[in-house]
UniProtKB/Swiss-Prot annotation:
This is NADH-quinone oxidoreductase subunit C/D. It is a peripheral membrane protein. GO terms for molecular function: NAD binding; NADH dehydrogenase (ubiquinone) activity; NADH:ubiquinone reductase (non-electrogenic) activity; quinone binding. It catalyses: a quinone + NADH + 5 H(+)(in) = a quinol + NAD(+) + 4 H(+)(out). Residues 1-189 are annotated as: NADH dehydrogenase I subunit C. It comes from Pectobacterium atrosepticum (strain SCRI 1043 / ATCC BAA-672). NDH-1 is composed of 13 different subunits. Subunits NuoB, CD, E, F, and G constitute the peripheral sector of the complex. InterPro entries: NADH_DH_suC, NADH_DH_suCD, NADH_Q_OxRdtase_suD, NADH_quin_OxRdtase_su_C/D-like, NADH_UbQ_OxRdtase_30kDa_su, NADH_UbQ_OxRdtase_49kDa_CS, NDH1_su_D/H, NiFe-Hase_large. Keywords: Cell inner membrane, Cell membrane, Membrane, Multifunctional enzyme, NAD, Quinone, Translocase, Transport, Ubiquinone. It is an enzyme of class 7 (translocase). It is found in: Cell inner membrane. NDH-1 shuttles electrons from NADH, via FMN and iron-sulfur (Fe-S) centers, to quinones in the respiratory chain. The immediate electron acceptor for the enzyme in this species is believed to be ubiquinone. Couples the redox reaction to proton translocation (for every two electrons transferred, four hydrogen ions are translocated across the cytoplasmic membrane), and thus conserves the redox energy in a proton gradient. In the N-terminal section; belongs to the complex I 30 kDa subunit family. In the C-terminal section; belongs to the complex I 49 kDa subunit family.
């Protein structure tokens, strides 16, 4: 039985805590001794424990085999610690690697950290304990240079094979003008062309058996069913998929590196573009994490407005997913229906925020401006329209026997497999685990809303995943109706020195406010040195921001964990033995965009 009461809503999220009273810290100390760990006090809301490198595998194994085990590796990445000035009480480190684990039964997390010296960047792989560590370790090596001993294929994943250097190191340039001018010599051109030559062995695949050769097929990176710049290399025996390797990174824009050279405030527009369909949903975890650093508690009106915008974008994203999923199976009409409905949402979003897809409207401490006059009428008209329209999608397409025959039982996995691969969102809930952050770990006032979490019957297949999204749409409509009926009165910004920008109306009356306004608009707010973390239930699964402040106007390290990255890594384990046509349906059922994968 999962304990949903372990996250104390009365405890301020911005309070710095060491979590020494968390049971898992006591369990670790009892097993390995108190001297084996350094517990770091942060504003992440979870225990952060530094572990000795030689004990890493033992500690991770212990946590995974405990009663109420830590069964999901939620995230794994690194940090360049060399320029960090506020490291009081922490182990000496030039670099560090963190492992974020989740226990579903406890509804609790723990973050393990390992300190590394620049002259010894080796540590053991955890891929035998958590298979989804594969891509995370590859990316961490690529971005920082840590070598994970025993990794099955430690190669570049985001950057081209010929790329030189580790981009997230502090001594790696962040701007194109800091590089030497690019010159494409004949030698370099030949090298680049050679790197594009397909060699199955480099991808971990066999050319054939003793009796026959396999056929290899490139699906993407410009195939309509790959849903973006995404390539899958298929190893085929006839129509059967013997093996496949997803190839990502074509949409990589260095979003985490950008976080190190933008102010806390000016980075908000970038969050919209991590997953470009989610809009304000993607602003939420970043803004909440910054507010934890700042110690800001926002008014109830701000919380409810943020929930309302998030649910509008959730419906908007789900409509596109459902309609393109149906299109992948072979029906065209629902796509045109969906774009008509999505237009109504965009009109409403534009009336409130002034923008459509990428509003960049949430602010540190509030929102950009108050709700406009007449917003209630627009929202009521949409709520009156959408329920019957949703029934039309179900009756006209999703109950179609041909669609059911193409999707039921296809690309199926159970709860254990979902947790091993870090699956979240509807894919996980279809297996029977109702992990929805809005319910399990409420944020922005979600605890005040009455809604249900749709859950499947134990197996997540292509049909159950899309039907769960339909039910989630209905629940989002319930939440919007409550926002309409119960919108609190009050300010749209918190009265706090780090609210950015501060309330404009007081700048000409109070010198303190004028100074804050001038500094925060010109340089950006200065956040206290600390670490914070926030996860939210985004449109495609759990999205999170892990921020490190060194007491400046910019983030020292911005780590963005997106759901689509984990979901694409799972593809080979699910689709082996299926047909190419099944893969097309499976891709349509995942609900991903490549900006969310590649960041």
């Amino acid at each position: 039985m999962t304990d949903l009461t372990t996250h104390d809503l009365a405890q301020p999220g911005w309070q710095t805590r060491d979590h020494l009273n968390d049971p898992v810290v006591g369990e670790l100390c009892n097993r390995f001794g108190p001297d084996a760990f350094t517990v770091q006090a942060t504003r992440t809301g979870i225990p952060v424990v530094w572990v000795k490198r030689e004990q890493l595998l033992d500690v991770v194994t212990f946590l995974k085999k405990q009663p109420k085990p830590y069964v999901m590796l939620f995230d794994l990445h690194g940090m360049d610690e060399r320029l960090r000035t506020h490291r009081e009480g922490l182990p000496a480190a030039d670099y560090s690697v963190f492992y974020h684990l989740i226990s579903i039964e406890r509804n609790r997390d723990i973050m393990l950290k390992v300190a590394l010296a620049e002259n010894d960047m080796h540590l053991p792989t955890v891929t035998k304990l958590f298979p989804n560590a594969n891509w995370y370790e590859r990316e961490t090596w690529e971005m920082f240079g840590m070598a994970f001993d025993g990794h099955p294929n430690l190669t570049r994943i985001m950057m081209p094979k010929t790329w030189e250097g580790h981009p997230l190191r502090k001594d790696y340039p962040a701007r194109a003008t800091e590089f030497d001018p690019f010159e494409l010599t004949k030698q370099k051109e030949d090298l680049e062309m050679e790197s594009l030559t397909f060699k199955p062995e480099e991808w971990g695949m066999k050319r054939g058996t003793e009796n026959e050769d396999f056929m290899f097929l490139n699906l993407g990176p410009n195939h309509p069913s790959s849903h973006g710049a995404f390539r899958i290399i298929l190893q085929l025996d006839g129509e059967e998929i013997v093996d496949c390797v997803p190839d990502v990174g074509y949409h990589h824009r260095g979003a985490e590196k950008m976080g190190e050279r933008q102010s806390w405030h000016s980075y908000i527009p970038y969050t919209d573009r991590i997953e470009y369909l989610g809009g304000c949903v993607n602003e939420m975890p970043y803004v909440l994490a910054v507010e934890k650093l700042a110690g800001i508690e926002v008014p109830d009106r701000v919380k409810t407005i943020r929930v309302m915008l998030s649910e509008l974008f959730r419906i908007n994203s789900h409509l596109l997913y459902i309609s393109t999923y149906i299109q992948d199976v072979g029906a065209m009409t629902p796509v045109f229906f969906a774009f008509t409905d999505r237009q109504k949402i965009y009109d409403l979003v534009e009336a409130i925020t002034g923008f459509r897809m990428h509003p960049a409207w949430f602010r540190i401490g509030g929102v950009a401006h108050d709700l406009p006059r007449g917003w209630e009428r627009l929202l009521r008209e949409f709520l009156d329209w959408m329920p019957a329209r949703l029934d039309t999608y179900v009756k006209s397409a999703l109950q179609n026997t041909i669609l059911k025959g193409r999707t039921q039982g296809v690309a199926a996995y159970n709860a254990k497999e979902a947790l091993e691969w870090g699956v979240t969102g509807a894919g996980l809930r279809a297996t029977g685990i109702g992990f929805d952050v809005r319910k399990w770990r409420p944020y922005s006032g979600y605890e005040n809303f009455d809604f249900e979490v749709p859950v499947g019957d134990g197996i997540s297949d292509c049909y159950s995943r899309v039907m769960l999204k339909v039910e989630e749409l209905r629940q989002s409509l319930r939440i919007l109706d409550q926002c309409l009926k119960n919108m609190p009165e009050g300010p749209f910004k918190a009265d706090h020195p780090l609210t950015t920008p501060p309330p404009k109306e007081r700048t000409l009356q109070h010198i303190d406010t004028l100074i804050n306004h001038f500094l925060q608009v010109s340089w950006g707010p200065v956040m206290p040195a600390n670490e914070s973390f926030q996860m939210v239930e985004a449109t495609k699964g759990i999205n999170s921001y892990y921020l490190t402040s060194d007491g400046g106007t910019m983030s020292y390290r911005t780590r963005i964990r997106t759901p689509s990255y984990a979901h694409l890594q799972q593809i080979p384990s699910v689709i082996r033995g299926c047909l190419v046509s099944d893969l097309i349906v499976y891709l349509g059922s995942i609900d991903f965009v490549m900006s969310d994968v590649d960041r």
